[in-house]
């Protein structure tokens, strides 16, 4: 029969466990893990942290850019509103100036019309005075003529009245 060690060897050769090999493999595996941790895992984790920081910074930068864009948009909207208000004020000022100028033109035209009216009235008055003067001259000459005819012939009161009325009618026709 077989001894116990033979059975272990047979078991190991058939698929059993070989403890000394396993311990050596475990030792080397732990060394491999330590080396991987030091040379691979550490740099890999530092790269991952670096990448995480980079992404976080990019997100923060994007947020800042978005905030700046919003602020610029608000500023532009405020400027646009201010420009609109200024343009509206300029339009209102132009309307007011136009109304003022319109009133000044109307006032000037009225003053000119009043001046022309006064000049026309003065001309009419002068013509009236000349006509009255001419009429007075005519009446005076007729009065002299009547007086000379009266002197030439003595007339009755009726004849004198008739003569005066005739001369007045003549003066009225001469006008």
From Swiss-Prot:
Q: Report the InterPro entries cross-referenced here.
A: ATP_synth_B-like_membr_sf, ATP_synth_b/b'su_bac/chlpt, ATP_synth_F0_bsu_bac, ATP_synthase_B_chain
The chain's disulfide connectivity reads none
Q: Gene Ontology terms, cellular component aspect?
A: plasma membrane; proton-transporting ATP synthase complex
User: What coarse category fits the chief subcellular location reported for this protein?
Assistant: membrane
Q: Where in the cell is it found?
A: Cell membrane
Q: Which UniProt keyword terms apply here?
A: ATP synthesis, Cell membrane, CF(0), Hydrogen ion transport, Ion transport, Membrane, Transmembrane, Transmembrane helix, Transport
Q: Does the keyword Metal-binding apply?
A: no
Membrane topology type: Single-pass membrane protein
GO MF, any single term: proton-transporting ATP synthase activity, rotational mechanism
Domain of life from the UniProt record: Bacteria
Membrane-spanning ranges:
22-44
What is the annotated quaternary arrangement, including any partners? F-type ATPases have 2 components, F(1) - the catalytic core - and F(0) - the membrane proton channel. F(1) has five subunits: alpha(3), beta(3), gamma(1), delta(1), epsilon(1). F(0) has three main subunits: a(1), b(2) and c(10-14). The alpha and beta chains form an alternating ring which encloses part of the gamma chain. F(1) is attached to F(0) by a central stalk formed by the gamma and epsilon chains, while a peripheral stalk is formed by the delta and b chains.
Any idea what job this protein has? F(1)F(0) ATP synthase produces ATP from ADP in the presence of a proton or sodium gradient. F-type ATPases consist of two structural domains, F(1) containing the extramembraneous catalytic core and F(0) containing the membrane proton channel, linked together by a central stalk and a peripheral stalk. During catalysis, ATP synthesis in the catalytic domain of F(1) is coupled via a rotary mechanism of the central stalk subunits to proton translocation.
Please give the family membership noted in the entry. Answer: Belongs to the ATPase B chain family.
Query: Could you identify this protein by its name?
Result: ATP synthase subunit b
Organism per entry: Oceanobacillus iheyensis (strain DSM 14371 / CIP 107618 / JCM 11309 / KCTC 3954 / HTE831)
């Amino acid at each position: 029969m077989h001894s116990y060690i033979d059975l272990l060897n047979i078991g190991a050769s058939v698929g059993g466990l070989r403890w000394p090999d396993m311990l050596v493999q475990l030792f080397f595996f732990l060394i491999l893990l330590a080396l991987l941790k030091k040379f691979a895992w550490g740099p890999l984790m530092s790269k991952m942290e670096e990448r995480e920081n980079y992404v976080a910074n990019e997100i923060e930068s994007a947020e800042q850019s978005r905030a700046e864009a919003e602020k610029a948009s608000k500023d532009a909207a405020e400027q646009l509103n201010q420009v609109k208000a200024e343009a509206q004020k300029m339009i209102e000022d132009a309307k007011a100036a136009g109304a003022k100028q319109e009133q000044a033109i109307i006032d000037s035209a009225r003053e000119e019309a009043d001046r022309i009216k006064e000049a026309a009235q003065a001309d009419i008055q002068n013509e009236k005075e000349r006509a009255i003067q001419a009429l007075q001259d005519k009446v005076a000459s007729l009065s002299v003529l009547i007086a000379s005819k009266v002197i030439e012939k003595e007339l009755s009161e009726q004849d004198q009245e008739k003569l005066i009325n005739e001369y007045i009618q003549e003066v009225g026709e001469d006008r």
